[in-house]
Design a protein with these regions (language model features):
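Membrane-interfacial amphipathic/re-entrant helices at transmembrane-helix boundaries
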Residues: 2-68, 107-110
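Hydrophobic alpha-helical transmembrane segments
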Residues: 23-31, 59, 88-92, 109-117, ...
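Hydrophobic core segments of alpha-helical transmembrane domains in multi-pass membrane transport
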Residues: 26-40, 73, 116, 145-150, ...
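Single transmembrane alpha-helix segments in multi-pass membrane proteins
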Residues: 32, 37-41, 52-104, 128-135
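Alpha-helical transmembrane segments within multi-pass membrane transporters and channels
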Residues: 105-145
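Transmembrane helix-bundle core of multi-pass membrane transporters
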Residues: 133, 137-200, 227-230, 250-258
């Protein structure tokens, strides 16, 4: 093999290593942190308290709502925007769902579509303000956040709504085979669907293009405003999924759900 061929081969290996580092270093670092915290927790609390499947089930249960909402936020951020109202959107849609099902006696099958309708309406307002009016995402979603919070507090009078119907409680406290939380399964399914859409569809690639350079995407024939608008709709849908798992996970609807 000639020296030139060897140099090309070495360069290609270096490129592969560099690409691997670029693509996977954040994931490797995250896994490393998980291992470190697991070891520290094991040393501090012992195996009987931390390294148990019961504890991992509880972690999955508690993290599912945040994980579902984070998916929608990530999709918006791919376009270069963000939405700080998603947590309060979860708050409002869960409170509305609780009132419809518990106070008004509406069947779960009828209440859930109305929850999605409310969430999509809020997402549409955010998307319209940011994409078509040109309001900065921070200003637009900050205002929407406080509107959602105020409406949720108004309609619930800051009082929890306990004892949700069993059908909706199954989403937040139900388990497959008594071991795997339903809400965690929903979260994983949503992530898989999002990965497939973003990787293998034209719309997904266009979302990345908009985030990379909105001007270049515009001159390439991509409707930048509509794609940004659409990501806010998708985020509102994931937030409503999160509210569906949040309502029964606490067995009540609370306007104080502001930590998201």
């Amino acid at each position: 093999m000639s020296t030139k061929a060897k140099n090309l081969n070495q360069k290609s290996v270096g490129q592969v290593i560099g690409q691997f580092t670029k693509d996977w270093m954040s994931i490797v670092g995250l896994l490393g942190l998980m291992v470190v915290f697991t070891i520290i927790s094991y040393i501090k609390f012992g195996e009987q308290y931390f390294l148990t499947w019961a504890n991992w089930k509880n972690i999955l249960l508690q993290a599912s709502t945040v994980g579902i909402v984070a998916l929608g936020q990530a999709i918006i951020m791919l376009t270069g925007a963000f939405d700080i109202s998603l947590g309060r959107m979860v708050c409002l849609t869960s409170c509305i769902g609780g009132i419809l099902m518990k106070n008004m006696g509406l069947p779960v099958a009828a209440a859930i579509p109305l929850m999605f309708l409310v969430g999509i309406t809020i997402g549409s307002i955010n998307g319209f303000l940011v994409s078509f009016i040109g309001v900065p995402p921070l200003v637009a979603t900050l205002g929407t956040q406080y509107v959602c919070y105020g409406v949720a507090k108004l309609i619930t009078q800051a009082v929890p709504i306990p004892n949700m119907p069993k059908a909706i409680a199954w989403l937040g406290r139900g388990y497959i085979g008594g071991e795997i939380p339903i809400c965690a399964v929903i979260m994983v399914c949503l992530y898989v669907i999002a990965q497939l859409l973003l990787t293998y569809t034209k719309a997904g690639r266009n979302i990345f293009a908009v985030g990379g350079s909105s001007e270049a995407a515009f001159f390439s024939g991509i409707n930048v405003k509509m794609y940004k608008f659409g990501t806010f709709i998708l985020a509102s849908i994931t937030a409503t999924f999160g509210s569906g798992s949040d309502v029964p996970s606490e067995l009540c609807c609370r306007y104080q759900r502001s930590e998201l």
